C-alpha cells in the first residue's frame, strides 16, 4: 500500500488521468518501469508514459544491513570504487535519489534520446543476493537487446557495477562474453553517486543521455585516462537486481 501511494501521489500532483502503478524489483526497479511503460505504449493502451524510480536507503537500518553483509566501504579516496577490477575488498556506498522520464512512441523532434532496443532475463540463484559467476542473466539480456543491433555500433556501456567483488566480476565477465575484443568504452556513475538501489537504472540512463547530448564520454577518474569514443551515437545501459534479474536498454542519440 505504501509503495503504490508513491506513484499515485505523483499522478495527483501532475493531474494525470491515466493508469497509475508501482512495482519493486530491487536494483533494476527503475528500468523495469521503463519496460512497463514501453509495454503500455506498444499495446496501444497509453499514448505516453511517465516512468522512473525512487529510493531513500540512507537509514540506520539499511546501512546496518550492508555492513552485516560485509560489503560496505571502509572509506578512503573514492570510497565507492565501481569498475575498479583491482580492488581487494567490497566498496559499497549507498546513495539516494529519484529520477523520471517521459516515454512517447516514435522518433520525436526534441527527444533527448531514442530507445532502440530492450532486453531482460532472469537466472536461477543460490540465495537472495547471489548472481552466477559469469553473469548469465545479464549476458542474456544484452544478447536480447543486441538482436538486430550490431554490437560494434554500440559506443559505450553504462555498467551496473554494484562495487561488490563477486558481482562486479560477474557483470564484467558478461560484458566480455557478449562483446569480446570489440568491448566498447565502459563507465558508471556509482563512484560519484553511490549505489542508489532501485533508482540506479534511471540515473544510469541519465548518464547515457548526457553523454549522447554533449558528445562527451564521462570516464571513471581513478581508472586512469581512458580513450573514449570520438563520437557517441549509441549507449547501452545495464541494470542487475537481487533475485537474479537483469535489464539492458540501448539508447540512440536524439534529434534536438
Where is each model-derived feature located?
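Fold-independent oxyanion-binding glycine-rich loops
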Residues: 13-14, 52-55, 96-97, 105-106, ...
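Conserved small-residue
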Residues: 10, 30, 37, 66, ...
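Active-site-adjacent elements of ketosynthase-type condensing enzymes
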Residues: 56-82, 121-140, 162-174, 199-207, ...
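A beta-strand-loop signature enriched in Asp, Gly, Thr, and Trp
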Residues: 127, 138-192
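Conserved catalytic cysteine-centered active-site region
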Residues: 1-36, 68-93, 166-203
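Short, high-confidence coil segments that cap the C-terminus of an alpha-helix
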Residues: 46-49, 154, 232
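Condensing-enzyme catalytic core mediating Claisen C-C bond formation in acyl metabolism
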Residues: 77-151, 155-156, 256
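Active-site-proximal alpha-helical scaffold in enzymes
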Residues: 3-7, 14, 20-55, 93-109, ...
Amino acid at each position: 500500500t505504501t509503495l503504490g501511494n508513491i506513484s499515485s501521489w505523483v499522478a495527483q500532483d501532475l493531474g494525470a488521468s491515466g493508469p497509475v502503478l508501482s512495482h519493486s524489483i530491487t536494483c533494476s526497479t527503475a528500468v523495469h518501469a521503463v519496460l512497463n511503460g514501453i509495454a503500455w505504449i506498444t499495446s496501444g493502451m497509453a499514448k505516453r508514459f511517465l516512468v522512473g524510480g525512487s529510493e531513500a536507503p540512507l537509514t540506520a537500518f539499511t546501512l546496518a544491513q550492508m555492513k552485516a553483509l560485509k560489503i560496505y566501504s571502509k572509506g578512503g579516496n573514492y570510497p565507492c570504487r565501481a569498475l575498479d577490477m583491482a580492488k581487494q575488498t567490497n566498496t559499497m556506498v549507498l546513495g539516494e535519489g529519484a529520477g523520471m522520464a517521459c516515454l512517447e512512441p516514435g522518433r520525436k523532434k526534441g527527444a533527448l534520446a531514442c530507445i532502440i532496443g530492450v532486453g531482460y532475463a532472469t537466472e536461477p540463484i543460490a540465495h537472495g543476493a547471489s548472481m552466477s559467476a559469469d553473469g548469465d542473466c545479464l549476458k542474456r539480456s544484452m544478447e536480447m537487446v543486441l538482436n538486430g543491433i550490431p554490437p560494434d555500433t554500440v559506443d559505450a556501456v553504462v555498467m551496473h557495477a554494484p562495487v561488490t567483488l563477486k558481482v562486479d566480476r560477474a557483470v564484467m565477465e558478461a560484458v566480455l562474453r557478449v562483446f569480446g575484443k570489440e568491448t566498447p568504452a565502459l563507465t558508471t556513475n556509482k563512484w560519484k553517486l553511490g549505489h542508489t538501489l532501485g533508482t540506479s537504472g534511471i540515473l544510469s540512463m541519465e548518464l547515457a543521455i548526457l553523454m549522447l547530448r554533449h558528445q562527451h564520454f564521462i570516464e571513471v577518474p581513478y581508472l586512469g585516462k581512458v580513450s573514449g569514443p570520438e563520437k557517441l551515437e549509441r549507449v547501452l545501459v545495464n541494470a542487475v537486481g537481487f533475485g537474479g534479474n537483469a535489464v539492458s536498454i540501448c539508447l540512440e542519440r536524439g534529434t534536438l
